């Protein structure tokens, strides 16, 4: 049965308008973005099938074009619709953590980093640069690829900090495996960066490791003193 044949108010768009987006399931929200389904499969059924095929909404939205377009009835247009929705979400998070904002809310920082890094299929090592009042100067992706203690150079971190005139730094990187637990290599490079920054009187406030569902904070574990 097509969505247009559903009882009034039960279609995903109508439900959203009547009750708000928070009352929709993942499949219903995705159906609103997709707009239509296939012959014999309405938009909600198509959306549910897409989510099931990838094991969840996050995995679907972080999948490559070739992976998504392998699904029956899903072509470049629907892939573009999905990516537009993802990018809008990232830009909203970026606006929420804009230049000049004082970082007084750890949850805001976590939400921003989760949106920026959790769906990457490769490792990204980044810096959140802050001024003397812990206002945001810039978020900078410094390295990409396989990151270990040998591939991250503290002198490049120091160089960027000096260039941007930062007074404090939050280091962050993601684990494409989805598991946020820091490795021994993560702890070693954190210590090296902290020591390098200390030579220019800049504080390392935290190192946050981003997984699929959580972020581990070195500061909260007492690993940065």
Curated annotation (Swiss-Prot):
It comes from the Bacteria. Residues 102-224 form the MPN domain. GO terms for molecular function: metal ion binding; metallopeptidase activity. SUPFAM superfamilies: JAB1/MPN domain (SSF102712), RuvA domain 2-like (SSF47781). Transmembrane segments: none annotated. Keywords: Hydrolase, Metal-binding, Metalloprotease, Protease, Zinc. A motif (JAMM motif) lies at residues 173-186. InterPro entries: MPN, RadC_JAB, RuvA_2-like, UPF0758, UPF0758_CS, UPF0758_N. One of its GO terms (biological process) is proteolysis. Belongs to the UPF0758 family. This is UPF0758 protein Sfri_3828. It comes from Shewanella frigidimarina (strain NCIMB 400).
């Amino acid at each position: 049965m097509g969505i247009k044949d559903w009882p009034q108010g039960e279609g995903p768009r109508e439900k959203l308008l009547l009750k708000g987006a928070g009352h929709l399931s993942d499949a219903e929200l995705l159906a609103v973005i997709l707009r239509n389904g296939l012959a014999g499969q309405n938009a909600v059924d198509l959306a549910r099938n897409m989510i099931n095929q990838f094991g969840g909404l996050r995995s679907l939205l972080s999948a490559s074009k070739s992976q998504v377009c392998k699904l029956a009835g899903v072509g470049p247009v629907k892939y573009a619709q999905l990516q537009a929705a993802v990018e809008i979400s990232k830009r909203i998070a970026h606006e929420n953590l804009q230049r000049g904002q004082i970082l007084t809310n750890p949850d805001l920082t976590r939400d921003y980093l989760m949106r920026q890094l959790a769906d990457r299929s490769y490792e990204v090592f980044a810096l959140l640069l802050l001024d003397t009042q812990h206002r945001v100067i810039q978020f900078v992706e410094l390295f990409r690829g396989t990151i270990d203690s040998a591939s991250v150079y503290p002198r490049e971190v120091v160089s960027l900090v000096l260039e941007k005139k930062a007074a404090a730094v939050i280091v962050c990187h993601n684990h494409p495996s989805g598991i946020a637990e820091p490795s021994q290599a993560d702890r070693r490079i954190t210590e090296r960066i902290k020591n390098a920054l200390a030579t220019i009187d800049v504080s390392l406030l935290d190192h946050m490791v981003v997984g699929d569902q959580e972020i581990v904070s070195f500061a909260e574990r007492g690993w940065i003193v």
